[in-house]
Amino acid sequence: MGIQDFFKSAGEGSCLALCYIRAALGKDATPQQFFDALWKAAERNIINVKKECFVEDAIALMKVANPTKVYSVIKKDVSSIAGIKLGAVRYSYNGYSHWVLVEDGKIVFNSLENSQCVKYGTAKEARFITIGE
């Protein structure tokens, strides 16, 4: 994997991976921590750089970011973020999708400053995340 391949893939489609990393690291995560976790995950084939940073193993990705915790992930279709304690949620709009991290029914992390999918779209599916000691 070339470094430019990595950056191109990360720029195009790492939103779900970044949500998992943010969930594992918490609200004080630094850009350097995001980069380090994403790079390590790519090196270990936990994310697939050839498929726009597709997450192959969410739990392994969060373990790379923060190995001191225990994680579980449950996939479900949703139509709203209300009631979601912690989860990555996919919004869809006009044929495009974007993932954000939701805590207590509110978006707490969005890797894009301005996402049309989130602004105009609807919640379609979620990855409910549980974190333990």
Positions of PLM-derived features:
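Short, structured beta-strand segments at or near domain termini in extracellular proteins/domains
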Residues: 121-133
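Active-site nucleophile-adjacent alpha helix/oxyanion-hole segment immediately C-terminal to the catalytic cysteine
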Residues: 1-48
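Histidine-centered active-site/metal-ligand motif
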Residues: 98
